[in-house]
């Protein structure tokens, strides 16, 4: 589970430095909930060793993992997934993640990460709380649902007004009033909160 740095002096191994980057306690919970929100495939790509990557992947429950990858490898992976017709979200915080973030459909960077990653990303979130990823997906799902329902209502309502007008059941002035009233109603509904609560999460 450790990344190893080897130090040599005069061509001879003098020390091995073991580095452990603790796993975020909410990581497994976040990945599980992203699946519940509709994310079908979650992949981890890291420059760490195979042993370290395998250990982390098994703990958090990703679908696939790739170890010892270079920045161009990450970018090429994103390109290949897009060629398969998939929408790709890339999350990263380092310079090495920047090419892949740039190639993705939606790039998400950590606010405490490299400046270049933040500049080219579409969204920046705080690294203090990975639960923000769940909130983003929930907002996306709710927004798309609201847009879909609003569009269907507007089309259906206006079509009904047209048919009633053609049939002579509704006067033009009444039809115009109802049309404007429905527009105001849809606008007011669009201003309501998409999520009731985004602050409470239970993970172990």
Language model features with spans:
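Membrane-embedded alpha-helical bundles of multi-pass transporters
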Residues: 38-39, 60, 64, 96-97, ...
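Cytosolic catalytic headpiece
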Residues: 1-96, 102-106, 138-141, 200-204
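ABC-family ATPase nucleotide-binding domain "signature/switch" substructure
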Residues: 109
